[in-house]
């Protein structure tokens, strides 16, 4: 998993509240257990149109507009990621290329899944998010700098906004660790514990 320290990138605005995981990645794409390849289906129902039996880009959708090509930061509204707990949602966001999502609030399960997949969720107050939407609308191709070690978002005008972050989640993201990799960092301690347990409770082990 790629570590997250500082990212400066184009911001794509998605000005809709309560975007659920079915909107992020529709159910027909959930058959795969591969994390790669889902980016092309991100926001599928909004991103594409059906014309003459063919799927074509919706020119009105933000991800199809040239100003937001290569965006790595998604600006969203409150309760982003609500709905079912499908992990395919952060898989699709990550595969598209998003490193961070900024919003006033996120659904809890979605938020945890994002941490496990290296996506930083930045919670900012509603008035700050409103201001950022205004700035992005006025300046297509608008960029933000997100500094995770400092827990700070910096704008093109040099305004700075601090954001809260769970210490454990911050450690995982900064070092590119999921739960399994975090556990493996304690491999020696686990082996010592298992050896001790083998001596004190041998019936628990089958050689």
From Swiss-Prot:
Pathway: Amino-acid biosynthesis; L-leucine biosynthesis; L-leucine from 3-methyl-2-oxobutanoate: step 2/4. Its EC number is 4.2.1.33. SUPFAM superfamilies: LeuD/IlvD-like. It catalyses: (2R,3S)-3-isopropylmalate = (2S)-2-isopropylmalate. Keywords: Amino-acid biosynthesis, Branched-chain amino acid biosynthesis, Leucine biosynthesis, Lyase. It is an enzyme of class 4 (lyase). Gene3D superfamilies: Aconitase, domain 4 (3.20.19.10). GO terms for biological process: L-leucine biosynthetic process. GO terms for cellular component: 3-isopropylmalate dehydratase complex. The keyword Amino-acid biosynthesis applies. One of its GO terms (molecular function) is 3-isopropylmalate dehydratase activity. InterPro entries: 3-IsopropMal_deHydase_ssu, Aconitase/3IPM_dehydase_swvl, AconitaseA/IPMdHydase_ssu_swvl, IPMI_Swivel, LeuD. The keyword Lyase applies. Heterodimer of LeuC and LeuD. Belongs to the LeuD family. LeuD type 1 subfamily. Catalyzes the isomerization between 2-isopropylmalate and 3-isopropylmalate, via the formation of 2-isopropylmaleate. NCBIfam families: leuD, PRK01641.1. This is 3-isopropylmalate dehydratase small subunit. It comes from Acidithiobacillus ferrooxidans (strain ATCC 23270 / DSM 14882 / CIP 104768 / NCIMB 8455). The lineage of its organism: Bacteria, Pseudomonadati, Pseudomonadota, Acidithiobacillia, Acidithiobacillales. The gene is leuD.
């Amino acid at each position: 998993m790629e570590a997250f320290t500082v990212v400066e990138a184009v911001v794509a605005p998605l000005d809709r509240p309560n975007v659920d995981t079915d909107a992020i990645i529709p159910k027909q794409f959930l058959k795969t257990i591969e994390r790669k390849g889902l980016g092309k289906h991100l926001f599928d129902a909004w991103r594409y149109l059906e014309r003459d039996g063919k799927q074509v880009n919706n020119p009105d959708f933000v991800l199809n507009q040239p100003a937001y090509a290569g965006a790595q930061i998604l600006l969203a509204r409150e309760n982003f990621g609500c709905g079912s707990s499908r992990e395919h949602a952060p898989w699709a966001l990550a595969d598209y290329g998003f490193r961070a999502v900024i919003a006033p609030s996120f659904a809890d399960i979605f938020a945890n899944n994002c941490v496990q997949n290296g996506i930083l969720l930045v919670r900012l107050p509603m008035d700050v998010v409103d201001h950022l939407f205004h700035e992005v609308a006025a300046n297509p191709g608008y960029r933000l700098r997100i500094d995770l070690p400092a827990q700070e978002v910096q704008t093109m005008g040099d305004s700075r906004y601090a954001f809260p972050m769970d210490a454990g989640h911050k450690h995982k993201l900064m070092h590119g660790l999921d739960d399994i990799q975090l556990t493996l960092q304690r491999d020696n301690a686990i082996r010592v514990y298992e050896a001790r347990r083998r001596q004190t409770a041998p019936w628990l082990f089958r050689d």
